[in-house]
Amino acid sequence: MVAFLSAWPWENFGNLKYLLYAPLAAQVVYSWVYEEDISKVLWCIHILIICGLKALVHELWSVFNNMLFVTRTLRINPKGIDFKQIDHEWHWDNYIILQAIIVSLICYMSPPLMMMINSLPLWNTKGLIALIVLHVTFSEPLYYFLHRSFHRNNYFFTHYHSFHHSSPVPHPMTAGNATLLENIILCVVAGVPLIGCCLFGVGSLSAIYGYAVMFDFMRCLGHCNVEIFSHKLFEILPVLRYLIYTPTYHSLHHQEMGTNFCLFMPLFDVLGDTQNPNSWELQKKIRLSAGERKRVPEFVFLAHGVDVMSAMHAPFVFRSFASMPYTTRIFLLPMWPFTFCVMLGMWAWSKTFLFSFYTLRNNLCQTWGVPRFGFQYFLPFATKGINDQIEAAILRADKIGVKVISLAALNKNEALNGGGTLFVNKHPDLRVRVVHGNTLTAAVILYEIPKDVNEVFLTGATSKLGRAIALYLCRRGVRVLMLTLSMERFQKIQKEAPVEFQNNLVQVTKYNAAQHCKTWIVGKWLTPREQSWAPAGTHFHQFVVPPILKFRRNCTYGDLAAMKLPKDVEGLGTCEYTMERGVVHACHAGGVVHMLEGWKHHEVGAIDVDRIDLVWEAAMKYGLSAVSSLTN
């Protein structure tokens, strides 16, 4: 049975919970449109604005927290936040709705207070002093006492406070993630100083806005998992150790739970003899080690941006959005101009940066981002700059001791760098293994084709992947219709096949040659007209970037080749572009397998057809699994 006040009344509403703000918004709109006077509903406007500011504070702290390229050396808990924690904290903003409802009810039940709020001055120095006094003498001790009680009483901790502590890695969103009862108590803790100021006649809008926003700001600070304070600050002014907590201070509370119960002021932990003795030493240690090299990743996936809209799928933009497969969202459109400007800035000044990470069997796996977008790879004058970025990333990985670096999508474009061959030839003494991952990509596509298929139509047939697929299938006795206008390139591939299988490779120059073939392997973009040649019931396997559009309703379409990471992956909380949770592109998975196997060779240039089955079996051995890509 659910404990009293442990669940939220709108728990099953989903995003419809935001309609609870509607009465306030409706009140404002009605007064503005029909009464042409909003002075009587200023309190509604203030509530809505403050709620928006509170949400913005959490979002900005989340952005900062997830900027690993800025915060990685100052992180307190080095673990990553996984999908389970993100889902657990999905409705972290319930408390903001609760506060809006409580304040609205108070205003409705107390018309004098409502009128007082509508006529508050912008600033009152006495009110600021009263606010500080009330916070220190009421809010801090009340919170400390109740927080400690929730920990020491087994019933209250088990049924209430454990919900907050079930997030293994502190995050700004963790700050608001608690039960209904705890947030009602927090409303009292944060509300009494504000109500007190108003009742004393010294309230002001600055006090209300400032305290409401700073209260959440400080809560996010304590949960941000990034030590932002310099240890020198507390050495120069030791008194600050009693007046303000640090992210390290509160992280120790989440790790050990029996100490550091204060709201914002460690003074009350000192008075209650509950301060963790390592609080300030650990804080100093983290700050001093900020310039030192942290753990070196065993594997790096070198990715790049696709387009401006998908750039907002980054975890340091909206964490919840990044934890779901990418789709274009209307609410992101207003951010497009700003993101476009950021893209231009990245083009001019940015270097390869840490994007995300996870751990697999004690191997640290990171994704680094090349600050370039898809269209830039097709600009002739941008080629050198892109290769310089990729080369710098490879050399950096080699210098710090990375074992394997895998090139994503366009970073291994044949015309750009020969599938990574350029870098391996230029730096023959590389210790890091450079991998394009296309061997596993080919394996995923090939193992998806039913065994009873005896004919396929292949576009992009003379590309690196197309060549490998054609040679593999012809050995299997499958007739491969290779779409290419180049007789020379076709014959070159045909000669690589064993003599007895060469007749299985057939050159075709037009799409109508495949009008009776129901298995299409697409390595080149198809227009609706070109797709129309496929007979009903055709399945389009594909390795073209970006994927072809699904025009045919009587056909099925495969997604890009992908694999699901093993179940024991830890700290994974970001979806890779349009992939489902825990699923990565096959070239990414290929690099992981290369690292796990400890292979010492570079996988660049042409795909070794003889290794396709070997790489597939290795992937299966480590628990990676093929992803069914059959979609209508």
From Swiss-Prot:
Gene knockout outcome: Plants show postgenital fusion between aerial organs and severe male sterility in low-humidity environments. Altered cuticular waxes, but no effect on cutin load and composition.
Reaction catalysis annotation: a long-chain fatty aldehyde + 2 NADPH + O2 + H(+) = a long-chain alkane + formate + 2 NADP(+) + H2O
Entry EC number(s): 4.1.99.5
Listed result of changing residue 408 to T: In cer3-1; reduced wax content
Compartments in which it is found: Endoplasmic reticulum membrane
Domain Fatty acid hydroxylase: 133-274
Tissue expression pattern: Expressed in siliques, stems, flowers and weakly in leaves. Not detected in pollen, seeds and roots, but expressed in lateral root primordia. Specifically found in the L1 layer of the shoot apical meristem and in developing trichomes.
GO BP terms in the entry: alkane biosynthetic process; cuticle hydrocarbon biosynthetic process; pollen sperm cell differentiation; wax biosynthetic process
Chief place of localization: endoplasmic reticulum
GO CC annotations on file: endoplasmic reticulum membrane; membrane; plasma membrane
Membrane topology classification: Multi-pass membrane protein
Family annotation (Pfam families): CER1-like_C, FA_hydroxylase
GO molecular function: aldehyde oxygenase (deformylating) activity; iron ion binding; oxidoreductase activity
InterPro entries given in the database record: CER1-like_C, Fatty_acid_hydroxylase, NAD(P)-bd_dom_sf, Sterol_Desaturase_Related
Keywords: Endoplasmic reticulum, Lyase, Membrane, NADP, Transmembrane, Transmembrane helix
TM stretches of this protein: 13-33, 41-61, 96-116, 127-147, 184-204, 298-318, 330-350
Domain of life of the native organism: Eukaryota
Subunit note: Interacts with CER1.
Functional note: Involved in cuticule membrane and wax production, and in the typhine and sporopollenin biosynthesis of pollen. Core components of a very-long-chain alkane synthesis complex. May be the fatty acid reductase responsible for aldehyde formation.
Protein family: Belongs to the sterol desaturase family.
Protein name listed in UniProt: Very-long-chain aldehyde decarbonylase CER3
Organism the protein comes from: Arabidopsis thaliana (Mouse-ear cress)
Taxonomic lineage of the native organism: Eukaryota, Viridiplantae, Streptophyta, Embryophyta, Tracheophyta
